[in-house]
Amino acid sequence: MRSAHFHTTDNGLSLLHATSIFPATNNKYWGRMFVWFDTMPTAPMWAHWSIVGAVGSGNDTEVRLGGQYDGSKNRFGVGTDHGPTGDWTNLDEDPGNPVPVDSWVCVEWLHDGGADETRFFWDGVEHPSLHTTATDHGGPQSQQYVLPDFEDVFVGWWLYQPGTTPGQFDVWIDEVALDDSRIGCSL
């Protein structure tokens, strides 16, 4: 068995897409994967990256799971681009530890379009600071965070800013699972 290896230079992207699981019952699905980061960006300030994203119809919101360099460390984060709430990322505050490098980490997520809710788990532990709802999110509070009717989910590595330090990234992803209920980290 081999892991999927994603190699990028600077602000590159390397992704695998899954569409066959959609439409999901009640527009809700759980995901789980194991991720190994060889390094994380340390420049530019606020370098922003994704390892999971989902899009669909109904609106142009792209739901993201990834993280951001805050000037001292990379932290996991959830957020979006496009859609009525715009581009935002909530960073992990539980307790806000850096994303581990050179070790496997189990990442789990919920995208519930029926309830307009997302959740994030790291090594089996939920991080409530990364829980979003239609009215509790990182965008303008005057706008509801409405999730799309999911049609496509990607996993991989996507770094958005150019001029990164270091100049290349290697990420390995293994044991990706998508289901209508929580999967967990046990293999």
Residue map of PLM features:
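A carbohydrate-recognition surface predominantly in extracellular/luminal proteins
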Residues: 23-39
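Glycan-recognition/cleft segments
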Residues: 47-82
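Localized edge beta-strand/strand-to-loop motifs within extracellular or lumenal beta-rich domains
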Residues: 103-119
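Flexible glycan-contacting loops in extracellular carbohydrate-active proteins
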Residues: 131-171
